Amino acid sequence: MESLINPSHGGGNYDSHSSSLDSLKPSVLVIILILLMTLLISVSICFLLRCLNRCSHRSVLPLSSSSSVATVTSDSRRFSGHRVSPETERSSVLDSLPIFKFSSVTRRSSSMNSGDCAVCLSKFEPEDQLRLLPLCCHAFHADCIDIWLVSNQTCPLCRSPLFASESDLMKSLAVVGSNNGGGENSFRLEIGSISRRRQTPIPESVEQHRTYSIGSFDYIVDDVDSEISESNFNRGKQEDATTTTATATAVTTNPTSFEASLAADIGNDGSRSWLKDYVDRLSRGISSRAMSFRSSGRFFTGSSRRSEELTVMDLEANHAGEEISELFRWLSGV
């Protein structure tokens, strides 16, 4: 009975256990609070750094883009300022190249296939506008060759230059003068077709034709005669040019017939208009190159002897350009 009434024997252990729990609760709470605060502070710092980084990128990008645009604009203006004259001369020469429709070319051979463009590798349609390169007598789609000539100043097939040199012009005009009395009213025009290159030997009938390599294809020039009326010729963008009664025959024979046909075309009063303009522009280009070479030699040479030699060379180049113009006027009777 006394043990039940007086619980002093087991009550001491219970009191010690409860007191230890009470002493542990504040320390645990403090540790948990410290951890939570550390976590919150670290997360806040991360978000703050990310926001600052985004703001800095937003402020730097407009400045860099504006500076790069200003640099590119100034460079383009500087280079465009230096290239005004060549680009203008180049565009004027391109505009002087003749344009005609493929339907205006009549083929004398009934077994002849339709021609193909060597740039886009597609067939010529009757209503397609073709542009002719007079120095090599190759014809292409006007849009195709215009895009090609923006970055390449040569023929896509034979790689002959668009802007002829003094020697090329003198050679062509000299042969023109010797063959002017032939009376053959013809102008050579090379139009061919695309053929996939094979491993087998080329047949003899194809070997007789003129063949050009275009990657994995061969461009075979048709060995037939064609005829085109001069009234179907347009010069550059002048689609309403005055028509004439003369005709220009397109011949795809050997290369030596080009000069004879060119002589006949020059001798014809009606068909020499666009060719005269083309040669005049080339002559002006030769004279401008001679003047630029002369000015650079005068300002950047160190000795008087060197300047005298350059002056003689410049006079010879200018004289060659004048001879070309005079020879052309004499041949055409201007």
UniProtKB/Swiss-Prot annotation:
TM spans (from-to): 28-48
Pathway entry: Protein modification; protein ubiquitination
Compartment(s) of residence: Membrane
Main location per the UniProt record: membrane
UniProt record similarity statement: Belongs to the RING-type zinc finger family. ATL subfamily.
Domain characteristics, as noted in the entry: The RING-type zinc finger domain mediates binding to an E2 ubiquitin-conjugating enzyme.
Name of the protein: E3 ubiquitin-protein ligase ATL4
Gene: ATL4
